């Protein structure tokens, strides 16, 4: 039960961050900038956090649940991404929808990779020091 409460706390924080950042970044261009940027940031943070904390044994299981599953998990939003893509398609904005889908996938995977590599690099630097 404790772990559930920890995830809920992280989820509360992450969902609020997503809402306020999404509001701040809302755009009239038709491209869902807020969701795109939020998912990209989340991919990088989760890739970095999980790798860095595992390699350096920094986070307890509870902190990993709070930050990874709760905060970052609720901060990113695949369901919103999916609905926004469908709305773009229904509005016959096929090019924008395609850019959004492929951009989100490649940027997300790319930033997750950069986060993992950065965490591994930081670990090597600490081993040298």
Swiss-Prot record:
Spans through the membrane: 4-24, 30-50, 63-83, 95-115
HAMAP family assigned: FluC
Subcellular location: Cell membrane
Binding-site list for Na(+): 73, 76
Protein's name in the database: Fluoride-specific ion channel FluC
Keywords of this entry: Cell membrane, Ion channel, Ion transport, Membrane, Metal-binding, Sodium, Transmembrane, Transmembrane helix, Transport
Domain of life: Bacteria
């Amino acid at each position: 039960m404790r772990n559930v409460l920890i995830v809920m706390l992280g989820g509360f924080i992450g969902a609020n961050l997503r809402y306020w950042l999404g509001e701040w970044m809302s755009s009239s261009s038709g491209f869902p900038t807020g969701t795109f940027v939020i998912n990209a940031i989340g991919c990088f943070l989760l890739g970095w956090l999980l790798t860095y904390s595992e390699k350096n044994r920094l986070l307890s299981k509870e902190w990993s649940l709070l930050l990874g599953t709760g905060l970052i998990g609720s901060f990113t939003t695949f369901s919103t991404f999916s609905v926004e893509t469908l709305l773009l398609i229904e509005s016959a904005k096929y090019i924008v929808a395609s850019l959004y889908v492929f951009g989100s996938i490649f940027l997300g995977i790319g930033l997750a990779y950069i986060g993992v590599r950065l965490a591994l690099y930081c670990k090597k630097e600490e081993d040298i020091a």
